[in-house]
Amino acid sequence: MILDVMFIVMRITNLLLIVSYEFVKFYCKKSINYFCNIPTYRLELIKNISKKLEQENIVYVKIFQALCFDKDLLSSEEQCYLLKYTDNVPYDTSEIDYDLLDKLEHDFSITLTNRTPINCGIVGLVFDGLDSSNNKVIVKMLKKDILQKFTDVFDELLYISYICKYIPYIKSLKITKMLLDNEEILLNQMDFIKEVEAIEIFTKKYKNNKEYKFPRVYREITEKYGNLLVMENITGLQFKDIELLDETVKEEFAYLLNKFAILGTLFHSVIHCDLHSGNVFFYINNETNSINNEVSKYGLGIIDFGICCFPNKKNQNAYYIFFNDIHYKQDYSNIEELLYAIIEEKEVFSSFNIIKKQQFINESIDCLILNTKDEITTQLLIDLSKVFNKYDFNFTEEFNKLILSIHVANHFGKQLSINLKATQTRVLADLNKFNELVFI
């Protein structure tokens, strides 16, 4: 027992030293560069910390990633770097459960085209395969003992967060709360049944939107073997394949991407929080049927549903106010309904006297006016967080996920569209025009 405690203390001390060293090194360099009039980018610090954490335990990077998204500490560029950083990581053959792969073939006639993974994330491994009808499938497998690794790392970071409560400035970040808020999100990424359910929900919600494709999942396999997820292979063009295409073509894809996100948030009550370029395939169909329009010329394939949320109808209406009234029309008449929906401490907000409540509302409006003229950026959440912190408020976990999805989708959208705000405005205008939004 004593040895276990000593081991944990040593690991925690080592982790603190690594992060502290990188911070000191970065700010020393920043100070020197300031006098030399040389720009210093914080992304360099993020990269260095990520590489050092990976050397200790790649799971640290995943939790570091989740914490930064939750508190809006990073720019969209920095966030997307972390997302892509964890897309393809090194693996060891000891992490592969070959016995389970044998059972998959024996019980369900799913054969792997190669037992070498085509991709490896922090949580799982991905293989190409074929089902009994020779249809191409993707097989996702959880790494051996990954849940225990997450639990160990999480406990260590909780100890560190308790220490951080006594460090000036850092204590204001409420790291312990951030860790506990994100524990469920991280664990859900290791629950393939939840991902199966998410894929089925998205497929059902978008059944009338033929421009979007989702993989068919083999639910019965995951129900028997919870560490496996087998789905249809819907591989299409990747971003690198369309990057140099004509801007008008990329603009069509940008429109579809934003339509997917806005429809999900405001109409279908489903939010995909990880909509970066690695999770989207592109389709160009030159044989569309103009009579029944069953197949659209341009389409998107969406994968990886490990981080999703499903807003209730009341919150959905608040998000409609955020996107349509405030962002699109600059109308703040329903701002109080929005604020009430995204505040965690609702009873405290309701107990405010009229003067204090109006002061909070006015400060929030000033922040929104300043930051919603163009596309929604990280700066909006940084500024709005300052207003919330002033009144001891926190964003709801759901709103944090919504903002994560906006950050990631907007960063990707800028790679597709020359004018993202114009594209988003066109989507909202079209949805309003054809009455495809539900007014609650």
What are these regions (language model features)?
Residues 1-262, 282-317, 321-440:
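Broad phosphate/nucleotide-binding scaffolds in NTP-utilizing and phosphate-metabolizing enzymes
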Residues 265-266:
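Helix-to-catalytic-loop junction in kinase catalytic cores
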Residues 278-280:
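Short, highly charged C-terminal tails/helix-capping segments
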